[in-house]
Amino acid sequence: MTQFDLLVRDVRVVRPDTDAVENVDIAVADGRIARLAPGIDVAEAADVFDGGGKLAFPGAIDTHQHWGIYNPLDVDTVSESRAAAQGGVTTGITYMRTGGYYLNRGGDYAEVFPEVLALSDGRAHVDYAFHLAPMQRSHIDEIGSLVDDFGVTSFKIFMFYGGHGLHGRSEDQAAFLMTPPGERYDYAHFEFVMRGLQKAREERPDIADRLSLSLHCETAEIMTAYTKIVEAGPLRGLEAYHESRPPHSEGLAITIASYLAHETALPTINLLHLSSRKALEAALIMAEAFPHIDFRREVTISHLLTDIDTAGIGAKVNPPIRPRDDVEGLWEHVLAGDVDWVVSDHACCRDEQKFGADRDNVFLAKSGFGGTEYLLSALVSEGHKRGLTDPQIARLTSWNPARRFGLGTKGTIAEGFDADIALVDPSATWTVHAEDSESSQEYSVLEGLELSAKVTDVFLRGH
């Protein structure tokens, strides 16, 4: 009888806690890493995989996905989790809320969330979890039960939803939000969400550090005003969308969110998809102003790889794709260690859904697109060019998100951890084509981009 279920031999193991990349074999038993050592006897394993000297990264943890936003959740869970695995992602955490899109219904999570779980159960090709957004007053009262009964540890606020639409200006956000009559989704609601989550943390000290709040930081009033100005002017495409949602809208929202966290004594705050120099600057200023708050800062791979001149309207997303100077600013902060994790913000939006009747009108297009299938390959490719080390990449894509979101057996390649492994050929040159993707989205905002690293093999708990 063999000691191990799987032996992945001849790989260069990348770990987040050491600068050394080790030439070792990885032995797996019962879905966990059982031994790391050079020259493990192949006779000890039931199955042997030759890694061919490739880099072995801990499986990426893509903590920002949107399964089911534009397509049925049961369908997206299958196709988009396959795309995730294609990108070296072994764990996806996807956002879910009530209101327009997703299940397209309001109500309490006690009724809605079991339906979400049933629709996704048994369909994913990767491990997964859900962040939940308290959209109405009753959801705040449910935070404790969502933690205790369903294991939810992460909650979200969309700061602009109360007064500005998902795709642009909106005259009736209440209908979109599907909240009870008389309720408002505003700063007061955000404060009460924070107080509700902090109460849950205080009542559960053993897991308090795993309970956090993520925020999409843009300011509705600024965006509505600027959208009217831009719509009346000559700008078109991604430049117009960028100008309609200016970077200082992010900075102001970050400032407000941070002070509310200070006021409510909620110390676990995640600032999502920061897209501009001003957003990162505001986030760092707030971290200095409120050192007792454990801020985590996120950027997306698309904001690191595209700008308003390299992509078309298919790249409409919130916050917007920015000019090249903002892209360079994001990279400066990534290299300086100011960013905690890199994600995809994957939201599969097929061509027939994405564009309006006038395909050239960015304000008629829907927001969001896919890209999880390129997460690790693209970050290794572009990161190596800019001096990002492999251990830094492992921290940005696996270790840091695992620690924040309480995934205690994930995040590194070490004995006792889940055997979630992504093999990367760091010298494979290839070109992005949407037709090669496992996603059901028919286009890619990275179409034609040449990458110099590629995920070749992925193991989820040793399979």
Question: What does each model-found stretch correspond to?
Answer:
Residues 235-266, 336, 341-342, 348-422, ...:
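His/Asp/Glu-enriched, well-ordered alpha-helical/loop segment
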Residues 1-57:
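Histidine-rich, glycine-flanked metal-binding segment
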Residues 51-123:
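Metal-associated gating/positioning segment near the N- to mid-region
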Residues 74-81, 137-146, 256:
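Short, acidic/polar
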Residues 356-361, 415-463:
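C-terminal cap of metal-dependent C-N hydrolases
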Residues 94, 129-132, 268-273:
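Short catalytic-loop micro-motif centered on adjacent basic/acidic residues
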Residues 141-157, 161-342, 347:
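Histidine/acidic residue-rich metal-binding segments in metalloenzymes
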Residues 11, 26, 31, 53, ...:
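Divalent metal-coordination and catalytic microenvironments
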